[in-house]
Design a protein with these regions (language model features):
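Structural motif corresponding to alpha-helix initiation and N-cap regions
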Residues: 10, 61-62
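Short coil-to-beta transition motif at edge beta-strands of beta-rich domains
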Residues: 71-73
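Short gly/ser/thr-rich secondary-structure transition/capping motifs
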Residues: 57-59, 112
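Short beta-strand segments
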Residues: 21-57, 76-79
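Short solvent-exposed loop/turn micro-motifs enriched in small/polar/acidic residues
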Residues: 18-20, 33-34, 90, 122-124
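Short, conserved active-site entrance elements at the starts or edges of catalytic domains
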Residues: 1-27
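Charged, gly/pro-rich active-site loop segments
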Residues: 1-11, 81-143
């Protein structure tokens, strides 16, 4: 099934997106090579937000931020795996990513903090990534 906005997703797909703990962010690096990164995320006001957190990274601007400055299109996938394959499902959001400076969007950071204890204890210092879906695709085995 496809949708244009988060509100158009079927209930099971929206619940998966809201309750999921880890997403996979697909983007393209400077050489044109596809990359997929696990990210934490939260849904807020029609967009999917992720933060560049305090986990160890190389010095300088994080690679994902560099890649998205160059090519701001990305795909984010949240899935549920089960050994009972009748329970398999996923939601994918494709769209443009905005890089929002640290401290410029306190509300999404609060939503991330409500979802992830580590963010409440030590808020992420880096920028926020705001993916605004242009297309959403969802699938589940039970249909």
């Amino acid at each position: 099934m496809e949708a244009r906005t988060l509100d158009q997703l079927p209930g099971w797909a929206r619940a998966l997106l809201d309750e999921g703990r880890v997403a996979r962010l697909g983007l393209v690096d400077e050489a044109g090579t596809p990359r997929v990164l696990p990210v934490t995320y939260a849904v807020y006001e029609g967009a999917i937000w992720s933060a560049v957190d305090r986990k160890p990274k190389r010095p300088g601007e994080p690679a994902r931020v560099r890649y998205l400055r160059r090519r701001p299109q990305a795909a984010l996938t949240v899935d549920r795996y089960s050994d009972d394959w009748s329970e398999l499902c996923w939601v994918q959001a494709l769209g443009r990513v905005e890089i929002i400076g640290a401290g410029s969007a306190p509300e999404p950071l609060e939503v991330l903090g409500a979802k992830y204890v580590a963010y409440r204890e030590e808020p992420p210092p880096g920028p926020l990534l705001k993916l605004t879906p242009e297309r959403l695709i969802c699938w589940r085995a039970a249909e």
